[in-house]
Amino acid sequence: MPSPTCYLLLNPTASRSHHRPRLPLPAAAPPRRRVHVSCDARRTGGGGGGGGVKREAIPAGTGKAKKQVVFFDAAPPVSQRGGGGGGEGEGEGEGEGKVARRKENAALGLVRRLTKRTLSLLSNLPLAISEMFAIAALMALGTVIDQGEAPSYYFEKFPEDNPVFGFITWRWILTPGFDHMFSSPVFLGLLALLAASLMACTYTTQIPIVKVARRWSFMHSAGSIRKQEFAESLPRASIQDLGVILMGYGYEVFTKGPSLYAFKGLAGRFAPIGVHIAMIFIMAGATLSATGSFKGSVDVPQGLNFVIGDVMKPKGVLSFVPDVFNTEVHVNRFYMEYYDSGEVSQFYSDLSLFDLDGKEVMRKTIKVNDPLRYGGVTIYQTDWGFSALQVKKNGEGPFNLAMAPLKLNGDKKLFGTLLPLENSGSSNVKGISMLARDLQSIVLYDQEGKFVGVRRPSSKLPIEIDGNEIVIEDAIGSTGLDLKTDPGIPIVYAGFGALMLTTCISYLSHSQIWALQDGSTVVIGGKTNRAKLEFSEEMNRLLDKVPELISVNEKKIDSKQSAT
C-alpha cells in the first residue's frame, strides 16, 4: 500500500526563472508563482527536492482548503517594498510592545510581592498585641495627664528646672500632643496601624478559614475518616439512620451516595471576622470623635440666653458646622437641692430651645447625669455659680450686685460682693460686705469688717447695718453648662454592641462529621475547633442512638427460639 504524499500544486503559467530583474516601476505587477500546500498527506521521498513528489494541477480555491504560499519571481515594486518596510516597523512595534508588557508584568510582580510582604507583616500576631498594649498605655497616660489645659498650666506643672521623675518636662507633654491625648497624631496613628493589622489578619487568615469551612467535603475513603480526631465504626448500621439522628442534634446533613457530611456551629467561624470588624468600628468612631466633634462650655445667669454656635469650638479637621448651631438656648430657671447638712446635693437648669423663627422647639429641666439632647448637640449640667444679689437699701431698689468668685483652698465655693455706702468716686470706698457659699444664706459684715448677721434670700427680713436697713430680695444663680457634638458616639456604641455579640458567638464550636457506608458497617469520623472533650461525649451519646440492623435470617432464628 503506497504511502500518501504531500501534493505541491504548481501554477504552470508562472515563470520558473530565478534571476534578479531590474527594479520594476511601481505600477507593474511582477509575475509570481502560487503554491498550494495540502496537509492531508505526507512525503514519500527524502530531502527537500521535488523527487518523489506527485504534482497535479488543481485550480486554486477548489477541493480542500489549502494554505497559499506566494513567491515573487522578481523584486517587489517600491510600493510593496514600503509595505515590507511597514512589516519591519510592525515587527519592531511588536518587539517594543513585548518589552513594554514585560516591564508592566515586572512592575505588577513587584507590587504583588510588596503587597504580600506588607500583609504578612501587618497580620503578625505579636505586632498586633504590641499595638494594643501601646494604645492601652497611652490611654492610661491620658488619664494621668490633665487634658485640654492651657500651655501655661503645663509650664507650671512640668517645669524644666525641676522635671517630674527627673526627666519629664512640659516638652514631653506638648510636643507629641499629649495634652490632647486622644486626638494626638501618635494615638491616632496607632489606631490606624491596629486597624490595618486587623484587616490584614482578616484577609490573610480568617476569610480563607471561612471559605474552607463552607465547603461540603465528602470523604470517600474509610482510611481518611479514621484519621479524624474522633473515629468510630458501627457494624450493622445505616448511614440514613445516622443522618436523621444528626439532624435531631442540630447538624446540617448532606449525603452523596454512600458518603455523609454534617456540620454545625459554622457561625463560630464567622465570629472572628465580626470581632475584627467591631473593633475597627470602635476605632473609627473614636477617630471621628477626636477629629470631627465640637465642644464648649458656658456660665449663664438665670433669665439670660445664648446661641449654641457662639460657644462651640471645633476639635479637628473633620468638624463641620451643623444647622443646629443657630439654635438659641434660654435659661428659664436655675435652682439647687441641699442635704440636711447644708451641702449641695443636686442642681437643675430649666432650659428652652428656640429656632431662628423664635419658635420653642424643645424644653427640658436638666440635672447632673441627665443631659438635654437635640439635633446631635448634648447639653450637660456640670457646674453652678452665684451670679448676683438683689438688695434693697432703705427701701430703695432693688439693686443688682454682681457676685464675684473668691479663691479658696479646697473644693468649696465662696462668692462675695460689696454694697457701697459712700460716693463710689472716692478713692477709699467703704460699704457692707456680703459673702455666700451657696444660694441659701448670705453673711453680712459692716464697714469695719465685723460680722453683723445672716439672712436667707427667701425670708426678706430686714437687717440694720451702720444705720441702713438692708433687705436681701433674691439670690440669682448661674448654671454651668458643657455642650458637645460627637458624631462618633453612635459608631462606638454600635461597635461595642457588635463586639459583645460576636465575642459570644465566637465561643460556638464548629463541629464536622464524616461517615461512609462500607457494606453493612458505617465508618464515622469527626472533629471540632474547640470543646473537644464535650464533642467526644456528644458523639458517643449520638452513636448510641443509631439503631442496629438485623438480617432476615436472624429474625427467623429469633422467632424460632421464642416459639420453642
Swiss-Prot record:
The protein's name in its UniProt record: Cytochrome c biogenesis protein CCS1, chloroplastic
Keyword Chloroplast: yes
Pfam families: ResB
Highest taxon of the lineage: Eukaryota
Membrane topology type: Multi-pass membrane protein
Family: Belongs to the Ccs1/CcsB family.
Thylakoid keyword on record: yes
Transmembrane domains' residue ranges: 125-145, 184-204, 270-290
Function: Required during biogenesis of c-type cytochromes (cytochrome c6 and cytochrome f) at the step of heme attachment.
Self-association and partners: May interact with ccsA.
Gene: CCS1
Subcellular location: Plastid, Chloroplast thylakoid membrane
GO biological process: cytochrome complex assembly
Location of the region described as Disordered in the Swiss-Prot/TrEMBL record: 1-36, 76-99
A Gene Ontology cellular-component term: chloroplast thylakoid membrane
InterPro entries the UniProt entry points to: Cyt_c_bgen_Ccs1/CcsB/ResB, ResB-like_domain
